[in-house]
Structure formats: C-alpha cells, structure tokens
Amino acid sequence: MSKKTDVLIVGTGCSGLYCALKLPGSLNIHMITKSCVEESDSYLAQGGICMFKDESDYHAFFKDTLRAGHYENNPLSVELMIRSSRAVLDDLLSYGTDFARDEEGDLKYTTEGAHSTNRI
C-alpha cells in the first residue's frame, strides 16, 4: 500500500494534533500511530493540559514533569514545554477550544499524575 502526502506526522496525541492544526490547510497531511488512538497517553489524560501559571511554580513544575516522565525526559524539552504552555493554551482558546471553568468563568485546574499542585 502506498499513499502520497505532503506531511507525515508520527503520533496522534496532543502534540501531533497541534502540529497538524498549525500547518497550512492546503497541505495533504497524514497521521500515523503505533497502536490505536484510544490507547495514547493524550487520549487517556482526560483532556488535561499542564499549565505554567506563574514563575513561583517553575521549579516544582519542572520537578513534577521529570517525575511524571520517569526521569527519561530531555530537560531542555521540559523547559520549552513549561515556558510555552501559556501561549499554546491561549492559541487553543483562540480556536474556541472548550476547557472546564469555575463559577467565575476562570479556567478550572486539577491535579493529575505526578503533579504536586493544581496545574492541569
């Protein structure tokens, strides 16, 4: 079987989907996954996105992320993910993505996985 494509994205989790979203709509994009979409970490994560709220949380966020990745993460990638999380969230909000909110309409945060505070 052969398919012609402009872009092949390996991975159908949040990062792969966000990559596809940011590419020009005129491109023929294909995405592949190693198993099935419903077994990816992103699918099982209940829709949560780790959010960097302020500088006072940076070191704990960094440590929690390393722990969540069983210390196999690239520290530079972790820093980039943390520092860019607000911009990515703002971008997703501009597309109209619906996130959980509290009674005042602010984003609602919870704790999941190895995180030590509500930032998801």
Regions found by a protein language model. Give the residues of each.
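A generic short-segment signal for beta-strand/edge and adjacent turn/coil regions
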Residues: M1, L17-L21, G48, D90
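Conserved N-terminal/central alpha/beta ligand/cofactor-binding core
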Residues: V37-I120
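A short, basic/flexible loop-to-alpha-helix module at the beginning of a structural domain
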Residues: M1-K4, E112
